[in-house]
Design a protein with these regions (language model features):
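Short acidic (Asp/Glu) and glycine-rich catalytic loops that position anionic groups and cofactors
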Residues: 25, 51-55, 114-118
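C-terminal-of-GTPase-core extension/linker across diverse P-loop GTPases
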Residues: 4, 18, 64-167
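Inter-motif core of Ras-like GTPase G domains
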Residues: 37-63, 75-82, 124
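Switch II (G3) loop of P-loop NTPases
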Residues: 1-9, 16-44, 61-64
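Generic enzyme active-site microenvironment
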Residues: 24, 58, 90-93
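Short flexible coil/turn linkers enriched for glycine and charged/polar residues
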Residues: 15-21, 51, 83
Length: 167
């Protein structure tokens, strides 16, 4: 299957490492042969990614199709204009990989993304391994993104000025 989840889940999360909160949106997962009537909903969900400060590109590290899925995500991000948004490549499901096989599987995962220069993090959402490293990468990316960004300034004028009409 190519995309598995069509619903977007959004939650606010406190990042102690950054001293601030962040909004996380979990968008579309992979399923194959998307029914034609769902294509528009699928695209609308993906366009939410264009507003992100950081994208967590989560890959099933135990999946034999991980390389194909990563390539498809990169293609779609480029198609929707989100290819320049900073990413963290997250290889999940370490708990499904036998400990003796982990070094080989992780090396293979890295080889599947040879051109990727974003941080790569290996985690198990199930048992929590690597999540502290992931949180730190997210905090670092947000801090560097926000430190270099010009924050919008608010005008001291009201939205409606009774003397001059609408502001």
């Amino acid at each position: 299957q190519l995309f598995a989840t069509l619903d977007t889940t959004t939650r606010q999360m406190w990042l102690a490492e950054a001293g601030r909160s962040a909004v996380l949106s979990d968008t579309v997962g992979f399923i194959r042969d998307l029914p034609h009537k769902l294509v528009d909903a699928f695209r609308a969900t993906l366009y939410e990614a264009t507003d992100a400060d950081v994208l967590l590109h989560v890959v099933d590290a135990a999946s034999p199709q991980a390389g194909e899925q990563m390539a498809e995500v990169e293609r779609v991000l480029e198609e929707i204009g989100a290819e320049r948004i900073p990413q963290i490549l997250v290889f999940n499901k370490l708990d499904l990989i036998e400990p003796a096989a982990q070094p080989r599987v992780l090396a293979d995962a890295i080889e599947r993304a040879p051109g990727v220069v974003t941080p790569r993090v290996f985690v198990s959402a199930k048992d929590g391994r690597g999540l502290d490293v992931l949180r730190q990468h997210v905090a670092d990316r947000l801090a560097s993104r926000l430190n270099g960004a010009a924050l919008p300034t608010l005008s001291p004028l009201p939205l409606h000025d009774p003397v001059h009409g609408a502001a």
